[in-house]
Amino acid sequence: MHPRLSPTVRALNAAAAATLLLGLAAPLGAQGAVDPNVAPRAAELERIGERQLGTEMLGRYLAVAQSDGRAWFLLARFYRLDARDWHRSGHRTSPDAELYLALSDVAIEEAVKLEVDSAPLYGALVAVDRALVTIEEQGWSHLAGSDVLPPLPPMVLELGRNLVANCPSGGVILAGSELEGVAVWYGVMGPGGRSDLLPVRPDLYAIDGRYRSQTARALGVSDSLGIRPALAAASAARAVCLTPNADSTLVPDEQPRIERLVRIIGPGDVPANAGLGFTQLVLDQETGSSVWSRDVLSVYGVASRRNPLLCRSLASVAGVLPGGACRP
């Protein structure tokens, strides 16, 4: 569990948290048989707007069938969605995001133990979400050197380092997808990361007053500004960098300069040691070991279509880049 969780949440071990907060009617008992139909039924409930019923179904089921990794993973996803809804509601609902994310963490740890392919990356997403709660409560400066991040799949970790490598010192960086977002977060906040950069979530800035207030303070702008004027004001003094899939309409109407994977608005020079690495990407193409290969390749493909010079560095994987990138 995360070291900054409240004492009450830290005191709950996995079994107690599941029993108390999933609303299980039955105590944890003997291991039951895995039913492959439960997770799809719960997912369908969520699809039709009955996530709470799906959560209760999974809770009762996992109390007796604790070896179903897919069900644990789906339960983690449901609790993370509950935390997202808490932000969107203006923090007016109960429980709060901290508790939902603690429960998501419990569930994803079980999914990791059961070797669900996507679980490690999802655990990283939950860790980022916990950090966002800390930002809202205590500000960006509280994060410096204080986070212990769970492991990230090596190819995604490499992607994050590549995405942040060419953003000028002191810049702001915007991601365009969850994959890019978690990769950038690790590239900034992880060991040896670009801690001089500020990874901003435009979607959260638009809907969450607490996040907007703390992030506007870090940007040095008024929190009365929307995300686009806030970034325009910030870009007068610092670079604003966009990952390959980031929305270009969020930044001022000027032609960005392209530096390898990122587009840049505003001042600042690219760090002198800003090399890119593709060791994990190439290794994965040889072994086929990562379920995230297609998504990571898609990011590089988008960047290569915008910046054909990248194709030289990506020559060894050019044949598998999507959308015709790097092909004659």
Please identify what each model-predicted range represents.
Residues 13-25:
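Bacterial N-terminal signal peptides
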Residues 2-16:
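Bacterial N-terminal signal peptides that target proteins for export
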Residues 26-30:
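Sec/Tat signal peptide C-region and signal peptidase I cleavage site
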Residues 31-170, 182, 187-328:
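ER/secretory pathway lumenal C-terminal domains and tails of membrane proteins involved
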